[in-house]
Structures are given as C-alpha cells and as structure tokens.
Amino acid sequence: MHVDHVAFGWDDLDLVRAALDVVGLPFDEGGAHTDGTTHMALTGFPDGSYLEYIAPTPGTDPEAAGFWPAALAGRAGPAAWCVRVDDVVAETKRAIDAGFAVEGPLHGGRDRPDGRRVEWDQTFERVDAPDSWLFPFPIVDRTPRSWRVSETDGVTALSGVDTVVLGVADLDGAAGLFDRRYRIPAPVPIETDAVDGEVADVPGAPIALTEVGESRLAQVGERPVAVLLGTDDLSAARTAYDLTDPVAWGARRVAWFDHDVFRGRVGVVE
C-alpha cells in the first residue's frame, strides 16, 4: 500500500495558506479541478507523496463542492486518502470481488496556474455509506505524474506521509473491513495521548485506527482524522517548523503543527 496523497479539506483555501505560512510549511499552488467547484494547493515531499489542501472555489458553497463536501463544510481537515497503483481497473475489480461498492474508474483533472492540464483516473470505494472515506481511492496518472506533483522547494526534515490515522466507529469492525479488502495484519494497540480515542497501529502498513465520537461520525463519517508526516530527526523538524511539544506514539514520538487549523490533524512522527 503506497500512499499517493492525503486530501486536507477546509472551507477557505486562503485560511489554510495563512496557517501554512505561520507554521513554516511551504506549499505550491495547484489550481482548480476541472469541474470548477474546488481548488487546491499542495506540499510535495521527497518520497513522492503529498498533502493536498482543498477548498471550494470562490463563490461555491462547500456543500456543492465536487469533492468531499461534508469535510470541506465541516472543516474536518483530513478528508480522504489516495494510494498509487499500477492498474486502476484491476484495483477496482479487486474491490468489487471483495464485495465493496465502487464509483469508477473516473477521469479526473485540474488546471494548474501555469495553464497545464493534469489528468488521472481514480476509483472511489464505499464501505457502507455514500460519504464513507475509510478506504483509500486508487489513482493512476494519464499525464506524467511530475505534472501533478513534485517536491516543494523548502521542505526539510520531512520524508513524506508516514501514517494516515483513520477515525472509525469500532476498531475491530474497521480492522475486519481492511482485512477483507487488503489482507492487512492485525492492528496492534499503542499507548498515546496524541488523540482522544484508543489507537491501533497496523504493522507494515501506513495506517492507524482510532475510535472517534458519535458527533464526528454523524458530521463526516468514517474517514482520516489525522495525517502524520515522517521524519528521522524530530529535533530538526521542530527547528524548521512550528510544532507542539512531542508526545508518545507507541514507541515513537509525534508533534503537531502548532496552529488551530492543523493541531490534532497534521503532525510529524519520528
């Protein structure tokens, strides 16, 4: 399972840009998606993964956004996640064979600020509700991937997306779904004060599960609740960026980007 990117949804992209400036995380402008309802910026990392900051275009109601309207309207932060695959049709068939509903493959695209159009194919997989984003969506580029993302100038002390933390109603139930779809190993509980609920890490996979409350589930459903960026030197990362004091994440340590937009949603793990 190779994380391509994590989408971070908000109702105003200018607010996210300002927060990125405050914490010192550089970003590139990405342009508007081809349906015209959302636009984005992104931070590309050395391992090829990236964070996508997505919001409604000016004049578009968040509820009318073509991507993840509930997350954008609710300022959920992490809204969905994506994995890179070699064959989106074959990956779609695997989801169907495992008994899950799919939407796709779908042709997607966006127009960069320099006028270049980026194109890809993706499939959205549903678990048990139309607004469920528990599973990642697979993606394959039609245009060169370097058109879609490249490493952002100024990124330092970060390797890329390390862990996608998924907010779920029940740890065992979610683990069973991932076993059925991806044949992952059994999640292992870890000790941490970084999030409110119980947390279980999946050995060898870039995911962790945490139980979230009914109010969040009612608002945005099961989907990513946080994303942790990898570093091999947390002290260097804390020098480069405005981060909170670190806390335990099992045997590792995690610190959040210290801004209301990102705290508890985007962090760095060593």
Residue ranges of each PLM-predicted region?
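N-terminal low-complexity or amphipathic/hydrophobic leaders
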Residues: 36-48
